[in-house]
Regions:
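Residues within alpha-helical segments
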Residues: 17-20, 126, 178
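Conserved core of the PLP fold type I
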Residues: 52-176, 191-192
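Residue-level marker for buried hydrophobic side chains located in beta-strands
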Residues: 184-185
Length: 192
């Protein structure tokens, strides 16, 4: 039976309580839980969807997938994406947890994630039966580990450090991953 570790964010409670006592308040970036009110547009959409009984499609609606592609074109200047390649999930946590499994990773494979990182990267590796390795530089890994790397996570802006990877750092990561045939997945949940 697979045993997953306790969720490490729970151990941060005393630190969060101490930070909350600071006279200037606190910007809690520890887990990314939304703190702003739900926008009116989203509230209306949820109300309208309340009477849409039945299960959703497993791959989202055509309109949703097209909206994602249009967003990338409008906000990121990325054109030519295929709506059929969009994988809607409930949130990034679900995607991060399941990507290693969806890629077919398993025993003997390595998933690399940043040293200071969201714990779900490691949980996703465990769910797939792969090994999670915390490293900020693939070239620093022992050769016998590096040759087993199949997935590399980047996180920019990073949680919890706030660090932003520049183009040169991303290029080094992509080049190193290509050298071992690994997929690079950029978790950019704080990009906006």
């Amino acid at each position: 039976m697979l045993t997953l570790p306790d969720y490490p964010w729970d151990t941060l409670t005393p630190y969060r309580e101490r930070a909350a006592a600071h006279p200037d308040g606190v910007a809690d970036l520890s887990i990314g839980t939304p703190v702003d009110p739900t926008p009116a547009l989203i509230r209306r959409a949820l109300t309208e969807a309340a009477d849409a009984h039945g299960y959703p499609t497993t791959h989202g609606t055509d309109a949703l997938r097209r909206a994602v592609v249009d967003w990338y074109a409008r906000r990121r200047g990325v054109s030519g994406l295929d709506p059929a390649a969009v994988v809607p999930t409930v949130g990034s946590k679900e995607f991060i947890a399941w990507l290693p499994t969806l890629l077919g990773l398993g025993a003997g494979d390595v998933v690399v994630h940043p040293e200071a990182a969201y714990p779900t990267y490691a949980v996703g590796a465990l769910l797939a039966g792969a090994e999670a390795v915390a490293a900020d530089d693939l070239d620093a890994l022992a050769p016998e580990v590096r040759e087993r790397v199949r997935l590399v996570w980047t996180n920019s802006p990073a949680n919890p450090t706030g660090a932003v990877l520049d183009a040169a750092a991303l290029r080094r990561t992509v080049d190193a991953a290509r050298g071992v045939g690994a997929v690079v997945c950029g978790d950019e949940c704080y990009a906006e």
